[in-house]
Structure formats: structure tokens, C-alpha cells
């Protein structure tokens, strides 16, 4: 069964990169889905405690697991110049079983401004730094939260996606939120 690690909003935080490496080691994903805001903390966010964009660049560029990424509102052309993965697309989509998986950061497309999707499709986004897993109007709205700068008293977090479910895990790798997709067998 496919197993994807879903991460968002690293914001140049070495501690966020370390959490991602722990999650890779623990879950052995076949692919990483990176939902933007990779290196820069942005003018509205506090500086992460371990702000070290160069360390995050080295980490991302050393990943052996394939990465599919989209651009966040804090990502710029200069970031693309130093990263060896494409990060300039506002969205990416591909099939996951019978569903369409739509990846975006959340500042262009959002739950309030969805692309055309059909019932059962998966809309993955970051941007809010708030983990979220809900079905609304037949579409699954999935947000892994932030590995570096969580908001509204949520923990640092990441997501795990399979063809049957989405689970948000906290920095201790405990299940924080989850949703099983309808018409999908429950995971063991």
C-alpha cells in the first residue's frame, strides 16, 4: 500500500527538518509530499528557535526519498536556485487509487477556494499551521499542520497518507488526528 509523508511549513527550521528525518526513519514513506514554505519564516511568523535555512537546504537536497513539492507564499525564486527539487508550482495533482490527490500550499487554493474536484477526492494543503482532517461536500480537506511553527496551541506535526486514510502525528510521533476515507477498508 502506498505510504506518503505529508509535511508543510518548515520555514527554515532545523528542528523541523530533524522531525521530518525522524518521521522518514520511522515510517519509511515511498514519497514525501511537501506543501510549501520551505526556507523563509515570513514576515508574519516569529523566527523559529533553530532557524537555519542552510541546514534545511542541505537536508532537503540530501533526501533519498522522492519529493513532490509545491510553492508556499513564503517561497521565492531564489529558493528554487538552492534546492534540487522543483518548488515553483502552485499545485500538483495525481491519482491515488480511484481518487485525485490535489496538493497546494493553501494561499491560492484553499477550502474556501477549491479547484474542481469530485466527491472522494483529496485536497492537501498547509499554510494555516493548523492540522485538519475533515470531509466537507464530499471532498477530504487534509492539512498536516506545521513541523516548525504550529498555531492555536497545536503541536508541531506532520501527516501520513495512504489510499485509505490520513493521519496527523505530533512531534512525539503519536496519532493526533485521523480520518478513514469512505469506501476504504479500515487500516490495521
Predicted region positions:
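Fold-independent oxyanion-binding glycine-rich loops
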Residues: 9-10, 37, 73, 105-106, ...
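Asp-based, Mg2+/Mn2+-dependent phosphohydrolase catalytic module
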Residues: 183-185
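Generic secondary-structure microfeatures
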Residues: 71-75, 98, 105-110
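Conserved beta-sheet core of the metallophosphoesterase superfamily
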Residues: 100, 107-177
